[in-house]
């Protein structure tokens, strides 16, 4: 994984997109109704970041700034990458 010079850990969320690991609050599966509402609310409020490159959304990442990031990578995979970054 790549690191910034300030030693903040980054998580690869697919297609060359990264999220600062310390800002992540939750990594969730997008299939439930509450997660669909969360995504729609974030879109309407301008807090949605779509990192899917036009592919199917497979995970939703919620940050401490209340931004919602859509990823085409499975939630389990993103979670494993997050855990690996915590271990380093």
Curated annotation (Swiss-Prot):
Signal peptide coordinates: none
Coiled-coil features, chain-numbered ranges: none
UniProt-listed HAMAP family: RemA
Family: Belongs to the RemA family.
Organism: Nitratidesulfovibrio vulgaris (strain DSM 19637 / Miyazaki F)
Top-rank taxon, per record: Bacteria
Protein name as catalogued: Putative regulatory protein DvMF_1139
Pfam families (alphabetical): RemA-like (PF04025)
């Amino acid at each position: 994984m790549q690191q910034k010079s300030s030693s903040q850990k980054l998580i690869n969320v697919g297609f060359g997109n990264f999220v600062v690991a310390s800002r992540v609050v939750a990594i969730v599966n997008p299939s439930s109704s509450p997660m669909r509402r969360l995504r729609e609310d974030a879109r309407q409020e301008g807090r949605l970041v779509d990192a899917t490159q036009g592919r199917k959304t497979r995970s939703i990442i919620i940050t401490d700034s209340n931004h919602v990031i859509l990823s085409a990578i499975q939630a389990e995979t993103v979670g494993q990458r997050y855990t690996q970054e915590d271990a380093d």
